[in-house]
Regions:
Chain A
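A generic local secondary-structure boundary/capping motif
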Residues: 30-32, 40-41, 119, 132-136, ...
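Small-aliphatic-rich amphipathic alpha-helix that forms the alpha element of a beta-alpha
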Residues: 71-95, 116-124, 231, 251-256
Length: 355, 355
């Protein structure tokens, strides 16, 4: 019997197989509006209220490294990445459940610090930490957060729904989280080298990361774009499709297009990249645009709106219009600063099983 | 600065510390009725509907051993233990979210098999597998399931609510899951010995476990007591307090008493123990009562009802009345078959951090 390694098929085809197996279970619950394949599941609670639900698992050495991550920040990030998924449905977060698998080396104080980070983020977003589960772990720390949010049926936004002619918008700036990660990894290597060579690692040899504060903060303490959800509601704009950028702009735009049955054309010179991100890319001899397209973990919102809504968002400093939705036949492309058009589907985002 | 190992304070005091940190976040969400400290969080959706939500994390080598656990059974069990938490609130399960951290050694076929077990259980309970998250893992498999259920405000049952004079009831039989686990562990040892000695391990040397089918099934494929929730509703009985037996009767009865501010007196000769469980205990020179009191993982329901409801449940073959709720001052005790009264608080259930 042939056995297939998961990395042979990758994360998204694995999710496809999982969806197929889960499919027959959906019939039991007629109020379910949307199952696997979006940022959240969506189900009807009443004629005026939908709930959305999401879960994210964070694994030591895969999603974080405690050598470079203050544990309180990690707690905050675990909340933020789930809030970001709720925001991607144009919904407001309400309740969080936290599951932990805790290695033997962890102390009570470390768990308290982790929860203080979660508490801080929960208070920021106005959500309740309402329950959870704790277990021991034979290996590293595992954090699984599940979150329930609410949205009016007229406001909910799925990945599908983009139409040719819609504008492609993105919040904030991209690539910063990837830049921050590269800096932290470099710093970790320097630290480990010093330890290996029995040399002191202290403030004298540590890089001054103060000037790269923003990028490191983007990596360690990302904030979900709850204010964008509120802004869009205040402006009376309902996006036709939305996703949060967790895998990278390229991959996440492809999710919108494949589920909407469309293509897209975006423009390099409109992609918001922070000056600091460009500086870090220069210093590390890397490409800031690649970080923006494939770095992931920016937790910005990528959404599409009908063209006639552009006036309603153009005064927002936080939203950039980076391109347009096209017919599927036109493909998914980016024009570079020289006017060349490049196929975006050749540029992949993060895949947990193919790294 | 003094650092405390988690095993010094144990699982329940750790949860206490977590609750304190989470407490301030509860104020943001006035619809939240019950936070950390019960089998589920409870929140109001409308005047006629509450939702309950729970999460359970299953970790390789802590909660399961793939040497003795068919992976499809594991999928089914991951669903059942969450349904059991929903049932403990007297609620009906609706939606499940599944998070997996998958080790590199896992194949696509193994994940499909895991999900087929989940699908099987989901169809059995009538719940939708509505979403999830997949990640790689540097070590063992981690499964985190979160589940949302529904209950009418007049039916919801918390751990608190037991009153002196109430009858203490339990469904099914206890200790079977512990008996099954001991058998599987013995079989694993025999297998590993054979492998170590380069001797074949095949059907000729494998123990015939057919006669212990029920106990092994209790361990590998427990079923949540959804039919008890339906039965109680049909009978018009609302338990005053309820919990599912995941840590063991002793520990879980103490949870009801501490949250209700009561004591309890139960009777050894009324505790339902399957004949097969007693046989296995004899064979392994262990004590079946200890398994029933502290073995855990039986996923039966432990609940209390007003004395005048006893007539409504006495025709159920699945429910045993094992004792009575008392004033707090009387403590929490068990009378043995010789009439001796023993303090139950000295008999501890499973603690993830003190094993």
């Amino acid at each position: 019997m042939p056995y297939k390694a998961i990395k042979e098929i990758g994360e998204f085809r694995l999710i496809g197989k999982i969806s197929e197996i889960a499919e027959p279970t959906l019939e039991a619950v007629p109020d379910l509006i949307n199952g696997i394949g979006d940022d959240c599941a969506v189900y009807k609670v009443s004629d005026t209220l939908l709930q959305v639900a999401t879960t994210d698992i964070l694994v030591d050495q895969i999603h974080f490294d405690l050598l470079t991550t203050p544990i309180k920040h990690l707690g905050s990030k675990a909340i933020s990445v789930n809030v970001s998924d709720i925001c991607a449905m144009n919904a407001l977060p309400r309740y969080a459940l936290i599951s932990l698998a805790i290695p033997p080396s962890f102390t009570v104080e470390m768990i308290e610090e982790l929860y203080r980070g979660m508490q801080h983020a929960a208070l920021h977003y106005g959500i309740a930490i309402a329950g959870g589960d704790t277990s021991s772990s034979r290996s590293g720390l595992v954090i699984s957060v599940s979150m329930v949010g609410e949205v009016h049926p007229d406001r909910v936004t799925l990945r599908k729904g983009a139409e040719p002619g819609d504008l492609v918008c993105v919040t904030g700036a991209l690539g910063g989280a990837a830049a921050g990660l590269r800096l932290l990894m470099r710093e970790k290597e320097i630290m480990l080298e010093h330890i290996e060579n029995n040399e002191p690692y202290n403030r004298n040899v540590m890089a001054d990361l103060q000037e790269y504060r923003e990028a490191i903060k983007r990596q360690l303490l990302p904030l979900a774009r709850l204010e964008t959800v509120r802004f869009l509601e205040a402006q009376g704009v309902r996006p036709s499709a939305m996703i949060d950028i967790s895998d990278g702009l390229s991959s996440d735009l492809q999710h919108i297009c494949s589920q909407s049955g469309t293509g897209a054309l975006i423009h390099e010179n409109r992609i918001p990249i922070h000056a600091e991100t460009r500086l870090i890319a220069d210093e590390l001899q890397q490409d800031a645009l690649t970080w923006a397209l494939t770095g992931g973990e920016d937790y910005e919102l990528l959404f599409t709106i009908p063209k006639n809504c552009s006036g309603l968002i153009e005064h927002s400093r936080d939203i950039s219009i980076i391109g347009e939705i096209t017919e599927a036949e036109a493909g998914i492309s980016i024009t570079d600063i020289y006017g060349m058009t490049i196929d975006l589907t050749a540029i992949k985002g993060f895949d947990h099983f193919q790294t």
